[in-house]
């Protein structure tokens, strides 16, 4: 059996690198694969990231909304199985749990998250404090019968960040309580993952004299058997004297080229062996069952065109891959366990993967709503057709002499019906035209029907469209035009019927519809052109600044080579400031005959700030 732990630094990117999740998982040839730093929120889980043939997956995603930590962490455990419905395989867990407190229990089959009881051994902690610990999605626990696997992504805390240091203390304190409780029950515990702790000086390149005095390193060493604890650091137990065995390097400084890194990805094992001998002296799971544990240094983590050349120097390159390497443990095949099914926490049961289960009530409600919508649609279409036919029928049955005197055709009468939807009410139409008593009965009926249709819905759409085009000035312009028409209405009344109809069609409809959009369009064009000019000016200025910075890159004082730009990401007064450093990769210090020669990293100080 084989277990692999790997900080993927973004699961989506690693899946894209291998073209599919299945190819990524098969590349390890392992039974249990533990990923850290998946950088996925729960709503971002999709089948292509969580489901692969022959594997069952269990995720823990970040739930915090804290700035800078949304979708930041996250862990996932993939188990290779032959049958998911019912199996005796050890790789398929009997139970699975998200988080370490027992309070985060995803009822995946129902699509909801419910609160469970506090895990055994954590009763003295406040409930709110425990909930905060599991908000960042840093652990998945799977019980495989013979052993319990803790897939852990430990918090990172810099020296001057008191809040994160306190959180790291609470996290590992609660985690240790869970381990102790299981060990008292006689269970075997495997802890795998990125713990963000290098326990010994030999686990860090160029560790300082006070390196091992760090409180978290002291806590890690207190867990080990040789220090009176219950756990064994499997890699160090198998390779006690190996140096320069690192699992993580800084990608920003190209440190992997010179193996300038640290060992922070671990596999810890605690518990007895499976032998039934009464004399347990010298027996342990590590001594009796573990065959090998090593670092997969040659594992393909980069795209082919970006594969680094290790320990051969060169300029810094931004590698497109994880800044960690996998670590594996292999041990003898274990006996099968009683037949069991896939735990409810499995991704196959997540609502975003398999969908939400509908109830009978929701099905009938949806069907009734669809029937009502269809009935309304049919009634609306039939009423619209009848109104249109009656309007055109009234116009066609009107006196031919009126149509001749108007000088318009049937199409123009229907266009008058559509134009009435521009927001002109019946009172405004009457005021603008003086009187409509001289119109024929057919034209009067069609006008009234057109106004009714506009009130029922078409006028709302027209107003919505025009509201995005009109400016405040255009409303005053419209009012002035209507007032001018009202003042001159008496002159239209004294004219012939044909001139009255012309006054309706020309000043009220055509004049109003043509003039207003022209004014608003001109104003929009002027506003858009001025904004475009400002954007173009800002873009040109920024390009000028970039060209100036590019042409004024300083040289490294030691190597006389062009430096590279960096940005300060540490919170403080210099946050966001740009500076220059040596372009060569980070490496160890070299001692030569005439004294101490500093490495390129320690010599690349700030050359110029921007």
Swiss-Prot record:
GRF-type zinc finger locations on the chain: 556-606
InterPro entries: AP_endonuc_1, Endo/exonu/phosph_ase_sf, Endo/exonuclease/phosphatase, Znf_GRF
Tissues in which the UniProt entry reports expression: Expressed in both vegetative and reproductive organs.
Active-site residues annotated for this sequence: 324
Keywords on record: DNA damage, DNA repair, Endonuclease, Exonuclease, Hydrolase, Magnesium, Metal-binding, Nuclease, Nucleus, Zinc, Zinc-finger
Family: Belongs to the DNA repair enzymes AP/exoA family.
GO biological process terms on file: DNA repair
Keyword Electron transport: no
Chain intervals for the UniProt region annotation (Disordered): 486-536
Cofactor(s) required, per the database record: Mg(2+); Mn(2+)
Pfam family, one: Zn_ribbon_GRF
Enzyme type, top EC level: hydrolase
Known EC number: 3.1.-.-
Protein location: Nucleus
Segments of skewed composition (Low complexity): 488-503
Name the UniProt record assigns to this protein: DNA-(apurinic or apyrimidinic site) endonuclease 2
Binding-site positions, Mg(2+): 7, 37, 194, 196, 323-324
Cofactor descriptive note: Probably binds two magnesium or manganese ions per subunit.
Polar residues compositional bias, start-end: 517-532
Any GO CC annotation of this UniProt entry: nucleus
């Amino acid at each position: 059996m084989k277990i692999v732990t790997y900080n993927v630094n973004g699961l989506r990117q690693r899946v894209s690198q291998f073209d599919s999740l299945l190819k990524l998982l098969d590349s390890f040839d392992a039974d249990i694969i533990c990923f850290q730093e998946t950088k996925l929120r729960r709503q971002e889980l999709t089948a292509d990231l969580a489901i692969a043939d022959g594997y069952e997956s269990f995720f823990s995603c970040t739930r915090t909304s804290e700035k800078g930590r949304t979708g930041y962490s996250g862990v996932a455990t993939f188990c290779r199985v032959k049958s998911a419905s019912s199996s005796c395989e050890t790789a398929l867990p009997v139970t699975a749990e998200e988080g370490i407190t027992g309070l985060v229990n995803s009822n995946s089959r129902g699509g909801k998250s419910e609160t469970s009881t506090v895990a055994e051994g954590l009763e003295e902690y406040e409930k709110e404090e425990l909930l905060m610990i599991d908000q960042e999605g840093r652990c998945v626990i799977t019980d495989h019968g013979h052993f319990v696997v803790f897939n852990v992504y430990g918090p990172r805390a810099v020296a001057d960040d008191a809040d994160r240091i306190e959180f790291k203390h609470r996290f590992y304190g609660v985690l240790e309580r869970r381990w102790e409780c299981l060990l008292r029950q006689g269970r075997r515990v495997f802890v795998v993952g990125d713990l963000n702790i290098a326990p010994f000086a030999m686990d860090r390149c160029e560790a300082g004299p006070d390196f091992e005095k760090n409180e978290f390193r002291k806590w890690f060493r207190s867990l080990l058997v040789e220090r009176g604890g219950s756990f064994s650091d499997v890699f160090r137990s198998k390779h006690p004297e190996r140096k320069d065995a690192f699992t993580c390097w800084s990608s920003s400084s190209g440190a992997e080229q010179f193996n300038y890194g640290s060992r922070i990805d671990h596999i810890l094992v605690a518990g007895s062996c499976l032998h039934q001998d009464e004399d347990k002296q010298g027996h342990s799971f590590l001594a009796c069952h573990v065959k090998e544990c090593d670092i997969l240094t040659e594992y393909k983590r980069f795209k082919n065109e970006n594969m680094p050349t290790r320990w051969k120097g060169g300029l810094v390159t931004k590698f497109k891959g994880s800044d960690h390497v996998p670590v594996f443990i292999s041990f003898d095949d274990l006996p099968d366990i009683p037949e069991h099914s896939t735990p409810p926490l499995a991704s196959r049961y997540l609502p975003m993967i398999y969908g939400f289960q509908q109830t009978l009530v929701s099905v009938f409600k949806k069907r009734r709503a669809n029937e009502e919508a269809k009935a309304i649609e049919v009634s609306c279409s039939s009423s619209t057709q009848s109104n249109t036919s009656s309007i055109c029928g009234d116009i066609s049955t009107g006196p031919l002499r009126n149509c001749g005197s108007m000088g318009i055709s049937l199409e123009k009468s229907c266009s008058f019906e559509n134009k009435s939807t521009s927001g002109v009410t019946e009172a405004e139409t009457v005021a603008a035209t003086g009187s409509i008593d001289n119109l024929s009965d057919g034209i009067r009926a069609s006008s009234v029907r057109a106004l009714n249709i506009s009130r029922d819905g078409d006028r709302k759409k027209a107003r919505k469209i025009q509201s995005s085009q009109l400016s405040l000035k255009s409303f005053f312009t419209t009012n002035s035009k209507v007032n001018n028409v009202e003042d001159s209405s008496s002159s239209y009344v004294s004219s012939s019927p044909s001139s009255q109809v012309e006054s309706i069609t020309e000043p009220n409809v055509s004049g109003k519809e043509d003039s207003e959009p022209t004014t608003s369009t001109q104003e929009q064009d002027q506003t858009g052109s001025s904004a475009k000019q400002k954007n173009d000016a800002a873009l040109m200025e920024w390009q000028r600044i970039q060209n100036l910075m590019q042409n004024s890159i300083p040289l490294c004082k030691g190597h006389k080579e062009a430096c590279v730009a960096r940005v300060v990401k540490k919170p403080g007064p210099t946050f966001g400031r740009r500076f220059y450093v040596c372009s060569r990769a980070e490496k160890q210090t070299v001692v030569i005959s005439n004294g101490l020669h500093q490495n390129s990293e320690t010599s690349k100080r700030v050359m110029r700030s921007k």
